Amino acid sequence: MVKYISILGSTGSIGTSALDVVSAHPEHFKIVGLTANYNIDLLEQQIKTFQPRIVSVATKDLADKLRTRISANTKITHGTDGFIAVATHPDSNLVLSSVVGVSGLLPTIEALKAKKDIAIANKETLVAAGHIVTELAKQNGCRLIPVDSEHSAIFQCLKGENNKEIEKLIVTASGGAFRDKTRDEMQTLQAKDALKHPNWLMGAKLTIDSATLMNKGFEVMEARWLFDIPYKKINVMIHKESIIHSLVEFIDGSVMAQLGAPDMRMPIQYAFHYPTRLPSSYEKLNLLEIGSLHFEKPDLEKFPCLQYAYECGKIGGTTPAVLNAANEIANALFLKNEIAFFDIEKTIYKTVEAHHNVKDPSLDAILEADQWARQYANELLIKKR
């Protein structure tokens, strides 16, 4: 069966990897829609290669500019409405949500309402509104298929298993660019230092989140919703080689793990062709060459953002959305070298502390909390600049 796919965030690292997968298996995958924010040069190339029916960009000016450069019969839209139009296009049956940040939330929700299966790589959607997204998926008979390597690993380990027999999930983490640094050393490090991820090729925002371990915190929160597992049953383990992507321990003591080379095209391909597998020409895992694998506990004093994620997830309500929004603001300013590395964790902590949580929030309440947190975090950081 051919999958007809729309990709939200086609010019990012996940989006370009996804298009590599489509190119490798044109008989199985066809592109219906693509979205990008500002990188219309790359989007132009993608349109010419994949001939989508519809694309969307951030602004009207960019859409007008793109129209002058495209002769293909592709509809060009813009803004949130344009992203939603791509996500809900009637010809697609699978939507890859790979945009960065909470901007992926509304298109994902509308795609679920349109009864699309979601290959989800946008952590923030489940962090901010996991209860809404998972309930919508159930109501509309849609599948949420994880794309992150860690969640894909758990998803694969649980295939054919009974979730009631899970003892715990073990989410692995590389440790990020600063894993071998002391707190004193980290204090003066800049964005260019954090962007040197030891194992994975990722976008800038995600690489900074990896350096703070906030990315792993988000993955814990994502796992809670994807697999309907309480936080007390989700552990994190540092695994520097990034070969074991995650593990599941069962009540009888058995442990299942999924291993593979650190290449995002593999979990993307699995999500695209689920529930069956396709051959690939990607690098194969050779354990004899690797020789040994190493594991250790995460240091929560050194990386407090991971602990913040656990605490905010347990509180629930609008607090996870506030955590995410404060992180997005601080992360972006650190990337611009306008604040110090430790200002990220301080901003998150102060913003969450100032928030008045709303339990069982509506989508509007989540979006309102998101906007409040962005403004509050910005005001905190104005004093730092």
Curated annotation (Swiss-Prot):
Residues engaged in binding 1-deoxy-D-xylulose 5-phosphate: K123, S149, E150, S174, H197, S210, N215, K216, E219
Top EC class for this record: oxidoreductase
Annotated positions binding NADPH: T11, G12, S13, I14, N39, N122, E124, G203
Catalytic activity, reaction form: 2-C-methyl-D-erythritol 4-phosphate + NADP(+) = 1-deoxy-D-xylulose 5-phosphate + NADPH + H(+)
Keyword match Oxidoreductase: yes
Cofactor requirement: Mg(2+); Mn(2+)
Domain of life: Bacteria
Coiled-coil residue spans: none
Cited Pfam families: DXP_redisom_C, DXP_reductoisom, DXPR_C
GO MF annotation list: 1-deoxy-D-xylulose-5-phosphate reductoisomerase activity; manganese ion binding; NADPH binding
InterPro entries: DXP_reductoisomerase, DXP_reductoisomerase_C, DXP_reductoisomerase_N, DXPR_C, DXPR_C_sf, NAD(P)-bd_dom_sf
Summary of the function given for this chain in its UniProt record: Catalyzes the NADPH-dependent rearrangement and reduction of 1-deoxy-D-xylulose-5-phosphate (DXP) to 2-C-methyl-D-erythritol 4-phosphate (MEP).
Record's protein name: 1-deoxy-D-xylulose 5-phosphate reductoisomerase 1
